[in-house]
Amino acid sequence: MAIIGIFFGSDTGNTENIAKMIQKQLGKDVADVHDIAKSSKEDLEAHDILLLGIPTWYYGEAQCDWDDFFPTLEEIDFNGKLVALFGCGDQEDYAEYFCDALGTIRDIIEPRGATIVGHWPTAGYHFEASKGLADDDHFVGLAIDEDRQPELTNERVEKWVKQVAEELHLEEIKNA
């Protein structure tokens, strides 16, 4: 089993593609990818490092598979778990709700002990509001807009994965 579990929910395939991009950069020996629709509580509990991919739909709603999984998520003890979040949203058509689902999932896992890493700068995005903010200048995780800024996705993912790997001291973990 890989040391990192990447779990995603996706209707259009965008968040799944991001999850696979992240896995490719980290390496299949380091990270495995799971569709949350086919995952269990035990699947998440098996990993001490989690990368959770959640898109935002319409007016700030979580993707339906994640929404269905939230009650299970609420049963997990996240103490000792390191978690990085990533998600897709549309900063133009849904500017008041851009990547809100990042905040929704954070609000579930953080009170249950999760240590969240991978905050991402808001610079370069054009939105009105987001529940996915860690502070005025950062999202709680990587925000991707495949609708309005697909040309920035590869660079954003690459930089974020490097940042998260450093925050997790991944080289030390892999060599232990």
UniProtKB/Swiss-Prot annotation:
Induction: By low iron conditions and by heat shock. Iron regulation is mediated through the fur protein. The keyword Lipoprotein does not apply. InterPro entries: Flavodoxin, Flavodoxin/NO_synth, Flavodoxin_CS, Flavodoxin_lc, Flavoprotein-like_sf. It holds the Pfam family Flavodoxin_1. Keywords: Electron transport, Flavoprotein, FMN, Transport. Residues 4-165 form the Flavodoxin-like domain. Its cofactor is FMN. GO terms for molecular function: electron transfer activity; FMN binding. Belongs to the flavodoxin family. Low-potential electron donor to a number of redox enzymes. This is Flavodoxin. It comes from Klebsiella pneumoniae.
